Amino acid sequence: MKTKIQCPAKINLTLKVAGKRDDGFHNIESIMQTISLYDYLTISANAAEKFDIKLSGNSTEIPYNEKNLVYKAAMLFIEHTNLPPHKIEIYIDKNIPVAAGLAGGSTDAAGTLYGLNKIFNEPLSLTELHKLCAKLGSDLNFCLEGGRQMTKGRGEVLEKLPFEKMNISLIKPKKDRKSVV
């Protein structure tokens, strides 16, 4: 079983950071927008004696091990489904710049959940996928659906907004910056 998933980058058109939550995160209100810059995942799954996850890709800037959010997403999917063991291989064709604030890792993790769900004939509902997304990060719920949406809470509350075409230019400085909300 094999599938290829297109994972779009996203930008924040607006961002309002509100009070701190009991869980240590901040409440946000943000209009997020997917853009036409993509990573691509090639996901394959074959029956095996035990579950095994292997990551590979074209970038030297990301880890291909358990520290990668894609790996964590695959593990979370396995833990929340009652599937027989498989060897899961995920190739990450990285085009979204790393550490650019464009949700490259988040969109790849959301794409992993979506792709595995597709390969295994949708054992999880969209609501269940969103619950897994929320466990992995604040912008994964948006990345699962994309488009233009108002996000609230920690990023788990989504409201679709009308889309108006716009042209943008993105500039990434040479020095990486980690985005933290």
Predicted regions and their residues:
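Short pre-catalytic strand/loop immediately N-terminal to key active-site residues, enriched for Gly-Thr
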Residues: E29, I88-G101
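N-terminal beta-alpha supersecondary unit
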Residues: K2-H86
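DPxDG-like acidic metal-binding loop motif
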Residues: V70, A100-L126, F142-L144
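Phosphate-handling active-site elements
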Residues: I78-E89, G115-L136
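Residue-level signal for inorganic ion chemistry
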Residues: L13, L41, V70, G105, ...
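Short coil/turn segments at secondary-structure boundaries
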Residues: E61-N65, P97, A103-G104
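ATP-dependent small-molecule kinase catalytic core of the GHMP/sugar-kinase superfamily
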Residues: K2-Q6, T14-S30, E122-V181
